[in-house]
Amino acid sequence: MSALRQIAFYGKGGIGKSTTSQNTLAALVEMGQRILIVGCDPKADSTRLILNTKLQDTVLHLAAEAGSVEDLDVADVVKIGYKGIKCTESGGPEPGVGCAGRGVITAINFLEENGAYDDLDYVSYDVLGDVVCGGFAMPIRENKAQEIYIVMSGEMMALYAANNIAKGILKYAHTGGVRLGGLICNERQTDKEVELAEALAGRLGCRLIHFVPRDNGVQHAELRRQTVIQYAPDSKQAGEYRTLATKIHNNSGQGVVPTPITMEDLEEMLMEFGIMKSDEEALAELEAKESAAAN
């Protein structure tokens, strides 16, 4: 039996992280891999496309109903989805009350202690990445996830979040085995997107694992609560996700300790690509507009 691989998909909210991870995992299960998904996002949408359902009941919600997490069985919180993929959602508290990361910690500890990680090839954590606070960093900090894949795009805030996540990985890389597996660029059709993604990967010392092209078929599948792999298995987009899955499967042991950059370096990189103007250029442009308006 091969060693259990614990991977995690991090990325800023709205980047398509959960969609990318679920399509990739659907492709991996077709390759004969045994998988457990642990959703670590308060939206609890990390398993929706695998289960073909609205939202899965979360560990925190079920624990509150039962009285405590100790009153639950694994069967209560782990549901079986597409081709046998096991799914669970950690959940979070009501908005404005408590720490959402607490659900992550509670769920992972419960699953480990109750044998949910037995007889698996992959455990995949789907984690919110706008903030790398204690709870959301738990899969990294506690050496649960060994390979981190950052889902990003050519948009500035996605690049900024990716660099921040790399900082979080670096913080714990030397005390545990966590490594940056690479970047996954989810196309947003911004200027020079592939080049920017490759440039950031170079700065972080990792690889751009795959560039996932934008395709309307993804939305069509999501409306039916399915992955593209299930909804349109013979489509070109399904092929893209299978390629990504194969690359991740072959990337075992290839992770790196990242070399995150400063905000100034990130802005400089954006200016090099003409995505962002320098203060001098912005000021000159403003003065030119004011001068034209005055005349």
Curated annotation (Swiss-Prot):
Its cofactor is [4Fe-4S] cluster. ATP binds at residues 11-18. Its EC number is 1.18.6.1. The modification ADP-ribosylarginine is found at residue 102. One of its GO terms (biological process) is nitrogen fixation. It holds the Pfam family Fer4_NifH. PANTHER family: LIGHT-INDEPENDENT PROTOCHLOROPHYLLIDE REDUCTASE IRON-SULFUR ATP-BINDING PROTEIN. Belongs to the NifH/BchL/ChlL family. This is Nitrogenase iron protein.
